[in-house]
């Protein structure tokens, strides 16, 4: 009934009203006159004031949200420094709270003033990093692009909840089309690809582990983890491995680390084979093998194509499912834009100096097609606001069936896409999916290629400048990523000689 009333403009039946029109008008007038003579109760005064400051659901009416956004633009500008100013927001870089004493606070009895509350919100950003400032140097926290910011904000205005179809409606296209676009980028069948926007790179890692546990231990959905299945990852894998293994109930002791090459930071596939051979002999199952496809600083890529071949040679013992190969590409994913770049024609006119690096990175990411699932952060090398992380999986039908619990939720299915049945979260904001989707649409392939290549051009320009300074030395000149690490010594010290010591 609710659905029919909200989706269709159906006229009420003739007997819908209990009173005839003249009688209902008289009754309403009498009721209004009586109410006008009585004082408004306090709760109604509070409610009236609060309701007047909520966003308007209708066009052409006074909208408190629009008014506050206008004021917000002015507040935003006050936080920004003048050009050439410091790398932080506002005027005070100090931390203005003490821990844990900051928590010794109570809720006010009286209702607050909207302008005052929003002024206090702005004050919270005093001293915060200004990611768009050229003086701000942090590894992978870029400024969000405008398309993604506005898209994300729209979700907050209309509270799109992407747990199921009726609460999201066409907003679900952002997540579904992301799956198709990224599936195409990776080299999978886009229609068979699925994705879930989740709480960060840690969420992607956790989903990758959960996928492996559910596929390898079929009874675990109902009976829990009763077998010490193993997680295999390199020594360079992200520390979230500990969070994911602990929270999934498998335990950190079941993480097995593969040695990495000292020069390349890549997984040693010979050692990987030794580990898999040993586990197979002991009849110990492997849940998930994780390839790190782009470490934060060194931008190292594990040879995932070779890992796939070795993993397939050592299947799990009888009675267990096939292990999942998860690619942790939350940092390195966007290099996949160069796997099909025409390096001979070089349409974006990159310098010869960086073409080889772009090709090297693109070739490494071309191997993502061998993965069962890939983790992607748009809020890192995607220039989208936090949090917009995407867990991408190759076989949507398998993943969703494996994780679909039996029965139905009390929410009725009204659309073909209802991820609430198999996601770790239930309620999910559309902010991340809209930000990621808007970024993909806005940048396109050439835009992303241009911004990535442009950073490399700048990186090597900085590298040349550092070489001219005797008291400075670049310590990662051979890395192929976006990060430049350098040391600064006192003026009278030969930086290169000192660093070699």
Feature map (PLM): residue ranges:
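N-terminal entrance/gating region of PLP-dependent enzymes' catalytic architecture
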Residues: 32-192
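Glycine- and acidic
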Residues: 102, 158-166, 189-196, 225-229, ...
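Conserved PLP-binding active-site segment of the aspartate aminotransferase-like
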Residues: 299, 482-501
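Active-site C-terminal subdomain of aminotransferase-like
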Residues: 295, 299, 346-478, 489-492
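Well-ordered mid-protein domain cores that form the structural environment of catalytic cofactors
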Residues: 143-248
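Short Gly/Ser/Thr- and Asp/Glu-enriched loop/turn motifs at secondary-structure junctions
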Residues: 191-192, 476-483
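Conserved PLP-enzyme active-site core in the AAT-like
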Residues: 200-203, 207, 211-400
